[in-house]
């Protein structure tokens, strides 16, 4: 049997009202919105981006875009698991966030479609640690957060997951089909 350790004793977690008044909680909620939006915007549009940029079939677009994104996202988590004792999580997440910005710029402004597609894959590598890392940092930053904190942070992340792809679609449509403008 493996014991399950609790961060907070039953009934000892912060209430929703206490969380709402906690600036650290709001910082993490913002991080979750950004993590969800940056992850899902690229992963949801990677297939269409690959199809339109590389002029390949839907099947090839699905393989080239989302598969590369997902594989590199998994690699990011495996790399952090392997080197977590050598690299502090806030440093890794900061590097990942900067890499995410770079990957979006690469995807949107890459002069070559293959280079732009590599930006999509690089985005997977960059966002892989953001969501799980933010949970770990939130646990340390709000040690009494409890179940309500985790639920609200997941909700913030889900809001980002919905808003990110929608925003890409709206901007792309406004730019008359310019997917690069949306990204």
Where do the PLM segments sit?
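Paired small-residue
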Residues: 103, 114-122
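Intracellular juxtamembrane helix-capping segments at the cytosolic ends
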Residues: 128-142
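A late C-terminal transmembrane helix in Major Facilitator Superfamily
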Residues: 144-177
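Extracytoplasmic gate region of multi-pass secondary transporters
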Residues: 22-67, 71-74
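Transmembrane alpha-helical cores of Major Facilitator Superfamily
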Residues: 33, 67-71, 98, 151-159
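Interfacial helix-cap and linker-helix signal at transmembrane-aqueous boundaries
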Residues: 50-51, 83-84, 139, 168-177
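Structural signature of the two symmetry-related core transmembrane helices
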Residues: 91-106
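Juxtamembrane intracellular "pre-TM" segments in multi-pass secondary transporters
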Residues: 2-28
